[in-house]
Amino acid sequence: MVKICCIGAGYVGGPTMAVIALKCPDVEVVVVDISAPRIEGWNSERLPIYEPGLDDVVRQCRGRNLFFSTDVERHVADAGIVFVSVNTPTKTRGLGAGKAADLTYWESAARIIADVSRSDKIVVEKSTVPVKTAEAIEKILAHNSKGGNIRYQILSNPEFLAEGTAIQDLFSPDRVLIGGRETPEGRAAVAALKSIYARWVPDDRIITTNLWSAELSKLAANAFLAQRISSVNAISALCEATGADVTEVANSIGKDSRIGPRFLSASVGFGGSCFQKDILNLVYICECYGLPEVANYWHQVIRINDYQKSRFVNRVVSSMFNTVAGKKVAVLGFAFKKDTGDTRETPAIDVCKGLVGDKAVVSIYDPQVTEEQVQRDLVMNKFDWDHPRHLQPMSPSSAKHVAVSWDAYEAARGAHAVCILTEWDEFRRLDYQRMYDAMHKPAFLFDGRNVVDPDKLRRIGFVVYSIGKPLDHWLRDMPAVA
């Protein structure tokens, strides 16, 4: 029986290996992680991550040919194919801090592989890494191998999953990308991994390239997607200034077959573990290769995203008589997108910090985010979310300004304003009349995801702001915001 081991039981490693186990019942798949609580979660009825459809896949395979373990060394030693799906966060200090990828976890994984391997291995980069990482990993493996004349083949097999649809993306991917060395051994390794995916992925969707093309393709894909979001968000600011409707503009340009409609929804900004991190990594790589114009081009995608978040906060404050001090603001949604509990780099963090910084009292509701997670996120510094550190509790002054509710109506009770920051479907179905009746007047609603009908809410009595939509008379009369 072929044995696959995956180092890293997070948002990528867990779902990916579960689907491989489901589609390849004759392959033994073991997911390993040094975090005992995380592995306990994968072995329990309540998985450590929320992803639609994941529970069912794990339930079918776990204990049959899918296993989760903290015994990293044993399972790495036994496997013929080792996926590495560890975090590659942005560096917080030292050379490249604030841009470069921190490969500490990747290097640690490579050293474990070298230390315990007693047979040839195919090592698969599943994490997003800088171009030429495979070359560095080859050197680490070659100089640290304890098992004699062991041969390693490094492959790049980046993930292209979207949280909230990860299982669907794995079942029916747009493409599977496999990059390897252009040698007989490298081509054989590519063929071996391709044979795994070929169990359920059509041949024309499995793309093979050289290593460097595969590594760069992942960074480029995320940069292009984030670029579309920042582009439509930039247009949303112009729409508000001119009276145009960003939804109509996006629909119009999306009908152009050369552009297409996806990733053209204006919002308070993009978040998640990948977009910002990968673009900053791309910026750093461009700078290292002496391409400052290219670096500046991609850095502007991040700058527009930051601008969109600060613009939203400024709109809230300026609309409410230029002060939110002591006013309750209900925040609906804290995850970076619907159908996930992931809060990494969520725009809600910056919005909530901005409101609290102006002395607002913030009441947060999200159906998949715990109070512990909210408080943890709001005390973190930028780029800290994937770095181990001793977290300090929220300061007493900040804590009294932040509360977490498990009900949208309770969050809005007694509030002066509601901010919608995640596009959860349930927010489209709320009884906004009931919510309005329990709020201070004038009652404001700031829709950062364009999930509600602004005209309907205005008829109820709300003062409504929707990203990129024509401003109502109240907002037009308020001072302009940057």
From Swiss-Prot:
Its EC number is 1.1.1.22. Signal peptide: none annotated. It holds the Pfam family UDPG_MGDP_dh_C. Pathway: Nucleotide-sugar biosynthesis; UDP-alpha-D-glucuronate biosynthesis; UDP-alpha-D-glucuronate from UDP-alpha-D-glucose: step 1/1. This is UDP-glucose 6-dehydrogenase 2. It comes from Oryza sativa subsp. japonica (Rice). It catalyses: UDP-alpha-D-glucose + 2 NAD(+) + H2O = UDP-alpha-D-glucuronate + 2 NADH + 3 H(+). One of its GO terms (cellular component) is nucleus.
